Amino acid sequence: MRFSTSNKLSPRQKLLLSYLGSDYCKNRIDGENVIYRDLGNYEIEISGCHTKKQPVAIFVWNKTDLTRTVESHARLPQDYEMIKTLLDDIVKRYTNKKENNNE
């Protein structure tokens, strides 16, 4: 799939971003336009959702070691309510969480 070289979200991503609210923003990570949220020591990347049928993927990254995801959810349907519920749970668990080398 070809992605735009600009930092513009697709219409489907814009709808999801609007649904998620002002705590989320657009970002460009590894050449892909994504939805992003900073949680302090962790960050959330919401990938995919570029077209009507493309699934959504959610990644939680430890900001001190960005080579390692600490949680991921792949091939999620574009069910905004379900995605928001999952993200709310992730936010509760990772906001202000101290780094833990035993994860």
Where are these regions (language model features)?
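A short, structured beta-strand/loop element
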Residues: 42-63
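C-terminal alpha-helix
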Residues: 89-93, 97
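Negatively charged, low-complexity tracts enriched in Asp/Glu with abundant Ser/Thr
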Residues: 1-40, 61-81, 97-103
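A short, charged, amphipathic alpha-helix used as a generic interaction element across diverse proteins
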Residues: 79-90
